[in-house]
Amino acid sequence: MGVGQSTELPGHAGTPEHLSHVLAERFATKCFTPLELTHFKDNFFSRAIDQGGMKYWNEKILSDFLGIPDSSDSHCPLDAGPVIFRMVSYLGAFPFQNTLAPSVLTFEAMVKVAVLLTERYGKVLRPARKDRIKLLFGSLADVGRRDVGASPGAEDVRKETDDSSAVKSHVTGFEVDAPANDDYGDEDEDDDDLALAALESLDAIDVFKHDSRIDKKVYEARISVATFRRLLMLLIVIAPLKTLEPVTSYSSDLNEARMESVRKEADTILAAFSTEDSDGGISYRSFANITSTALPYLFDPLTPLFEHLLFSKNLDMTKKSGSDAIVTDTIEKPSDSPGPSPSTIMLPGSFESSILKPSVVSHLSFFLPSPTSNVNLLRGNMRLHPVFSTAVHGSSLTSFSHNVLTWNAGTLLLLEGAVSEPSEHGEGMVTLGAYLPQPWKSAPLSHSSTKPSDSSALPCLFELSPKHQLLQGNPSPSVQKPNAPVAYFSTSTGIAIGCQVPPPSRSQLLTPTPLGAGSLTIDTSLDSATFYMSSIGHNGVFLPPATTSMSEETVKKQIDIYTLEIWGLVPEPSDASSAEPRQSAVELQRAKWEFEAREAERRRNLNLKAGAGDSAMEGARWLLETAGLIGDRPGQRGGSI
């Protein structure tokens, strides 16, 4: 790597320091291209502090380079620099967090940090997303910190670092990594699998067993709410960040109103993590459960953030230098112009959203996939097209049908209102939604099948506030029944999501009933809704949320609707999977509206005054029945997904 001699480890010999060096060498050569590594070195060494021959970064250098607001910036209320520095100091010691954490941010440590946070370790280690979650938890856990013994040399360097740095590291050791002999049963059989894979790749299993015994202490450690809130607020602000975009494009406009919106979303996400039984902190069990199931893309913004290390503005690799050849490998330069606002995900149309604020869009990207690929909504380059809003199109199912049934793509339903019967928790405003990757169909009781192996093709029902809750789509083929569509609407009963639709009846009006773990029903006037959620039930469209326990009662909320919005999911033209030109959902909808207008004009010209049995009369009646405008056959009016 250019910072030391690379030597291979024979057998099981070697110290943790040497093994850490070898792993960093392997990461650098296999996880980065030569050009990326050149840029990485320039970024690091051009800014590093030289203390007794050791080059390293302190907290201020790291925060300034990444553009992360910290306590030194009195004009910015987002103080996330110390949290990121703490995480990096922990991850830099991988896979020997017990012995080497907190690590000095040398080049080798930063290489490991960049590989782990950009998820490039798959070229050296087997992919293990769950184990990355444990590493992230360990890097954030600060309840019950302790002083870690270190060799005199390392301690001297750390002392010199503190003396020479204007900003302290805030990292004094990690109780999360203290070996313990407490018996926690088989709570997590694959602890430290990612670290184990690293040592397996170095033929150093014995060293691993000596340094990092099965560590059950992790289940006693906690992440403080204050620490996690600061990280969440940063992730919300930089969620739309693209590779090599400057962070300041998103952090420079943090006025009071923007920060209030960011805090609100952070608090709704925090509410999903159980802290009642954790002494005010977040336990590993809660952290791992929620981040892996209810917030699978929460840490995605860290990838483009740390990819900034792989491009240096000081280098122009396309020019000749003396007799050197032109470097053919290219890397995209970051734009100097301000980055786009998160709201640019919304395309212009018939209305502007009163629900989709930038912070809400960021919140959605933490758990909603792109319909075209298994990445989050923002990284999948999706756009949202305004399809229907009660504020503009009125509270009528006729208008809903005209706008939604003609949309031939996936949709996102959002609902904002007030709980009409506040619970003992004092809930007031609530924001709900449903992600429906399949288009609505005009045929009654139809059901679009999904691919169980493709999570992006599964629907989900969610609550954004006051508490983040996600009901994932059920991948079981057994729940795909004609009378249990994902979403259904009828002019007689309204809109039903995740419900069982009763058979038609001439004698009485039967309404859809909740099925499985969750459902949402909206009345025919689009004025009120009922949200149903249970901790049990695997026989419906949606599975129970990870944020509830088996002991919790079924939740039923009656909601007075303030705003109902439907947004169409539109992929970027450049992301179209087919090389053949194809009409977009927007163009198809316009074509359907034009067809409906022509048919309406044709119906106006029909002679309905002809005598009984007249062929014109029969033809007119047939046309109107076919259009579903007259006739009393059961199920004639309605639609579903």
Curated annotation (Swiss-Prot):
Q: Does the keyword Cytoplasm apply?
A: yes
Q: Which domain of life is it from?
A: Eukaryota
Statement: the UniProt record of this protein carries the keyword Amino-acid biosynthesis: no
SMART domains on file: TLDc
Q: What are the start and end residues of every segment in region (Disordered)?
A: 149-168
Spell out the InterPro entries in the cross-references: TLDc_dom
List, alphabetically, the GO terms of the cellular component aspect. Answer: cytoplasm
Q: What is the predominant subcellular site recorded for this chain?
A: cytoplasm
Query: Per the database record, which ranges form the TLDc domain?
Result: 354-570
Per the UniProt entry, the disulfide pairs are none
- So what family is this one in? Belongs to the RTC5 family.
Role according to the record: May be involved in a process influencing telomere capping.
What is the name of this protein? Restriction of telomere capping protein 5
Write down the species. Neosartorya fischeri (strain ATCC 1020 / DSM 3700 / CBS 544.65 / FGSC A1164 / JCM 1740 / NRRL 181 / WB 181) (Aspergillus fischerianus)
